[in-house]
Amino acid sequence: MGNPVVIKAKKDYDCVFEPEPMSWLRLQYYRYQVTAGTYLFTYKEAFVFNTVVFIIVFLTGWAAKSIIVKLLPSLWRLSTLIPSFFASFFMSLLGKDASSQ
């Protein structure tokens, strides 16, 4: 048997595999248009639809941020208690008194 033949893509087709950032952005916008059907809208309808989508995404992010900010102190306190709980738990399994350590 001979050596395997390796076929490399031409330079013209490299952008298909590794698109430039702007091409990638255009591709994502095209996918959004096709998925949501906004390519059928007029410019005004598309503007209103995109504005509503933007507001919904913004408000969802805002709500998630406010929930995370409220939960963060209690999660931080919980994360500081977990190691001491496991330390005392494993010490009790080993039969050692955790208070003497």
UniProtKB/Swiss-Prot annotation:
Keywords: Endoplasmic reticulum, Membrane, Transmembrane, Transmembrane helix. Its main location: endoplasmic reticulum. The keyword Transmembrane applies. Disulfide bonds: none annotated. One of its GO terms (molecular function) is enzyme activator activity. The keyword Transmembrane applies. One of its GO terms (biological process) is sphingolipid biosynthetic process. GO terms for cellular component: cytoplasm; endoplasmic reticulum; endoplasmic reticulum membrane; serine palmitoyltransferase complex. It is a multi-pass membrane protein. This is Uncharacterized membrane protein C23A1.05. The lineage of its organism: Eukaryota, Fungi, Dikarya, Ascomycota, Taphrinomycotina.
